[in-house]
């Protein structure tokens, strides 16, 4: 964050539009909260490495990739770093995929999952709705990843040919 902030200020920009209005509406009022939430989505496994954009993962375990906030630039960077599946959580319904790596879209709420069922693979709103525990949902996500990786199920972004690909140009991208 510090390096990115310096880069933004060097070209006369900053984080005044980040988090986005949609993020703020949903409670992500600072970059720190947004970043902490992104890290938490990795679960309880220890972070073994923090990678620069497109830097190849070389260690077994959970690595974080420093990407811009733009969804397509972020998924492109993760695929370039070696991701073989991208689990993309969304509370607003970003319709994105990747031509190199299957993107599994995970809705954070049931309203979104129902409204955009054509692009959502997994609804984690069942946790908030009291239908499933975090552990049960984790098992469901793991099972989906296994069948998607084996080709038994094709994620909706792949079915819909949502082949979005935008490399980050190393400028300021919020």
Which residues does each PLM region occupy?
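Anaerobic metallocofactor- and corrinoid-dependent redox/one-carbon enzyme cores
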Residues: 1-174
């Amino acid at each position: 964050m510090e390096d990115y902030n310096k880069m933004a200020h060097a070209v006369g920009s900053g984080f005044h539009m980040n988090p986005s209005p949609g993020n703020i509406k949903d409670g992500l009022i600072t970059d720190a909260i947004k970043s902490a939430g992104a890290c938490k989505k990795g679960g309880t496994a220890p972070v073994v490495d923090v990678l620069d954009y497109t830097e190849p993962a070389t260690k077994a375990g959970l690595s974080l990739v420093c990407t811009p906030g733009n969804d397509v630039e972020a998924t492109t960077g993760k695929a370039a770093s070696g991701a073989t599946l991208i689990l993309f959580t969304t509370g607003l319904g970003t319709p994105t995929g990747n031509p190199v790596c299957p993107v599994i879209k995970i809705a954070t709420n049931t309203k979104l999952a129902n409204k955009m069922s054509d692009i959502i693979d997994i609804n984690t709103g069942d946790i908030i709705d009291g239908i499933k525990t975090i552990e049960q949902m984790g098992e469901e996500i793991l099972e989906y990843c296994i069948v998607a990786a084996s080709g038994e199920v094709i994620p909706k972004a792949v079915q819909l040919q949502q082949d979005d690909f935008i490399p980050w140009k190393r400028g300021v991208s919020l």
